[in-house]
Amino acid sequence: MSSVEDLFDKLNADLAPGQEKRLNFDDIKLKGENLPGEPVDFSHGDVDAFEPVPGALENFNYGFNEIGGTQAYTVYRGREDILDDVAKKLSDYSSTSIDPENELIITPGTQGALFLAVGATITRGDKVAIIEPDYYANRKLVHFFQGELYPVQLDYLNHEDKAGIDLEKLENSFKDGVSTFIFSNPNNPSGVVYSKEEITEIAELVRKYDVNVIVDELYSRQLFDGRTYTHLASLDIIPKENIVTIIG
């Protein structure tokens, strides 16, 4: 049995996300001239600093000075008025119906949401399918909760109109007893977007084998070149108790 220290060691990372397999400059040939200006760190999703939205400071001061109680501890799932507002906006955005009382939890960031979702669905010895490549923390969290990994390859370099998931291998993993499937859409780090056909086939397989699925849709707003996006929950194929959607 692993100690608490051993488990938390599995979450450690010496480098920032996206830098765990950095190339040595001796291994690549740099082409072109140096570009002017400040360097941009592309190892994270936030590549720029954004000022607060208009009215943010005024509303914060109003809540702090006039209401007061908004700065006290709140219920763990989030304040009711915020849940109602977020549920409405997410329902409109994702083309699905979200019950704010029973189907929505507000967390301090999507990493916290991912930790809660994995911890709620995986226990020691559970078989878990993940995509390779995908968000680096997926693998770490499965190890932390002592699950057994089943990697499924994403052939994203050879497709332009889809992500390139190996659906046959995914189904075989379900046949072998995988109980939870974790993936991000758009894929992090490649940025490819799953086609509607791929998302539909994933949903059909999840329902057929009664698998839990955790889908990270954090970057679903960052679509380019006329790409279309299909929210997994919007297909209404998977029972709601079998799907967790993470979005920010």
Labelled PLM ranges:
Residues 69-205, 220-245:
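Conserved core of the PLP fold type I
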